[in-house]
From Swiss-Prot:
The modification N6-(pyridoxal phosphate)lysine is found at K230. GO terms for molecular function: amidine-lyase activity; pyridoxal phosphate binding; transferase activity. It comes from Streptomyces vinaceus. The gene is vioD. It is an enzyme of class 4 (lyase). Pathway: Antibiotic biosynthesis. Its EC number is 4.2.1.145. Its cofactor is pyridoxal 5'-phosphate. This is Capreomycidine synthase. Belongs to the class-II pyridoxal-phosphate-dependent aminotransferase family.
């Protein structure tokens, strides 16, 4: 294996988000940390296709290796959903994480310049670092509510830029380009020598405009990524995909031959049903999330300046700043220890005074989480007053 990531896992930096969630996720009683919609059960999925994995089908399922690009039925379902552009094909993967790994391993060499929208999910920056790339942040500025400023992107692009890596809607802030901004972004990349990596994990979770179109419809040098973990409520299936230029397929398959080879036929059968019934899974969760988003914004507005919350334009997370804190990590620890409430401290995204709050959960769970935060903020404020009295 000749790619820079072939140097071995020791080249990969720690993943602070996963380090935070690893044990706390299983300790929490109230989870308002998640960047995905709340999960579906197998029974709920089977209700969409009662024949799914019945006794007869299970008995006939052959546990053989799958095709390198993925099961044909699942690939066809994804293609019908996302509509890849000319010269692009769908490859299914073990979550979008595998697809991202394959892309960075295939495309990046030591010293390459990689532009990453920042703050970033750890895979988007960490894989570039492990590949020996020179990172150039495209800053999504907190003072602008993390709204993407394409002039800032223009300023960091150069003739040495190998990749431009974006994630819209953005994790953790929920910021998003609108359709006009998408067109301008694609034009900027088209006029450079760079390849665009478009993380579309949250594509279906938008609040102010229709979902953004698949970028390969308008750009040749692009790979896009999707997953069942965020909008579909099926993270435990560990299924994702990439839309990849045909001329790059053989390189991704070559690298995959050293990793996972293919997906389980059992998992791909379940995943195909999910994608074929995408709207039935996504629509109710998105409707619920929009109601909950309104509640989070009302809660923040009622905090008398203690919480400054940019409006999430997409996704199901808010990323508010806590104005009396320079680092909310201790607050997050207290929420879990005293209330059983799980949130994510902003330091894992390089924004220590912020907290990621997931709002796609049942309303009672969200209310418990917000009430616990308010209680801890009140305790903190009273302590400060005593300390200065």
């Amino acid at each position: 294996m000749t790619g820079p990531l072939g140097a071995g896992p020791q080249a990969l930096p720690a993943a602070p988000l996963e380090d935070w969630l690893r044990e706390r996720y299983f300790q929490a009683k109230t989870d308002i940390s998640s960047s995905g919609v709340h999960n579906y059960t197998f029974g709920e999925l089977r209700a969409l296709d009662p024949a799914l994995l019945g006794t007869r089908e299970l008995d006939q399922l052959m546990f053989r290796d799958g095709p390198s690009l993925g099961d044909e039925r699942l690939r066809a379902a994804v293609a019908a959903r996302v509509r890849p552009g000319p010269g692009h094909v769908v490859m299914t993967t073990h979550g979008s994480s595998e697809a991202l790994y394959l892309a960075f391993a295939a495309l990046v060499r030591p010293g390459d310049e990689v532009v990453v929208a920042t703050p970033a999910y750890h895979s988007l920056s960490g894989l570039a670092t492990a590949a020996g790339a020179s990172l150039r942040p495209w800053p999504l500025r907190p003072e602008n509510g993390f709204a993407p400023d394409l002039d800032d992107l223009r300023a960091v692009l150069s003739d040495r830029t190998r990749l431009v890596v974006v994630n819209f809607p953005h994790n953790p802030s929920g910021a998003c380009v609108d359709p006009r901004g998408r067109t301008e972004l694609l034009d900027l990349v088209a006029n450079s020598q760079a390849v665009l990596l478009w993380d579309g994990a949250f594509t279906d979770l938008v609040h102010d405009h229709p979902p953004l179109a698949e970028p390969s419809q308008d750009l040749d040098r692009v790979l896009s990524f999707g997953t069942l973990s965020k909008a579909y409520g099926l993270p435990g299936l560990r299924v994702g995909w990439c839309v990849v230029p045909q001329d790059l397929v053989s390189e991704l398959v070559r690298i995959r031959d050293y990793l996972t080879l293919s997906l389980s036929p059992l998992v791909e059968r379940v995943a195909a049903v999910a994608v074929e019934h995408a709207d039935a899974l996504i629509t109710p969760r998105l409707t619920e999330a929009r109601h909950n988003r309104r509640r989070v914004l009302e809660w923040a507005a009622a905090s008398e300046g203690a919480i400054d919350c940019p409006v999430p334009r997409g996704g199901v997370t808010a990323f508010p700043r806590f104005t009396a804190h320079t680092d909310v990590t201790d607050l997050c620890e207290r929420l879990l220890a005293r209330h059983g409430v799980l949130v994510v401290p902003g330091r894992v995204f390089g924004q220590a005074d912020r907290m990621r709050i997931g709002f796609s959960c049942p309303r009672p769970e969200l209310e418990r989480g917000l009430a616990a935060i308010s209680e801890e903020l009140g305790t903190h404020a009273r302590g400060r007053r005593r300390g200065t009295g």
